[in-house]
Structures are given as C-alpha cells and as structure tokens.
C-alpha cells in the first residue's frame, strides 16, 4: 500500500520536476510544466487520500516512484 502524502510533499515533488504555480481557486492550486501538463492539488491538506494522490500522479505524467511509492 502506498504511503499517504501531504499536499506540501506533493507540491515539492511537482516543483522539483519543473512544475510551477499558476493559480488557485478556493482550496485547489493549479501547477503547470513547460510541456503544458496541468496538475490540480488540494491545499492545504495534511494527508491526501490515496485516490487523490494517484490522480495527481496521472495528471502530472510523472511516475509513482517520483513521489516515493
């Protein structure tokens, strides 16, 4: 079972892989990379549900190993 990550951990991984903050609406922040991929991260949240983390991994195009799974 993958470990649960907080939104700060997810944001750190995204920024390390070239994503930058674009905008925020309510509690959801939008991050975008140079290739145009967009990932939406609910913020602030101590622990994200596993399904939400998997969705962010898919949106970003990164591998689960990049997030420490």
Task: Describe the residue ranges of each PLM region.
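Basic nucleic-acid-binding interfaces
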Residues: 1-24, 28-69
């Amino acid at each position: 079972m993958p470990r649960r990550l907080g939104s700060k951990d997810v944001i750190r991984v995204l920024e390390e892989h070239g994503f930058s903050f674009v905008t925020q609406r309510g509690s959801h922040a939008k991050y975008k990379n140079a290739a145009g991929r967009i990932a939406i991260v609910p913020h602030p949240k101590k622990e994200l549900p596993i399904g939400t983390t998997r969705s962010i991994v898919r949106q970003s195009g990164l591998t689960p190993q990049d997030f420490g799974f």
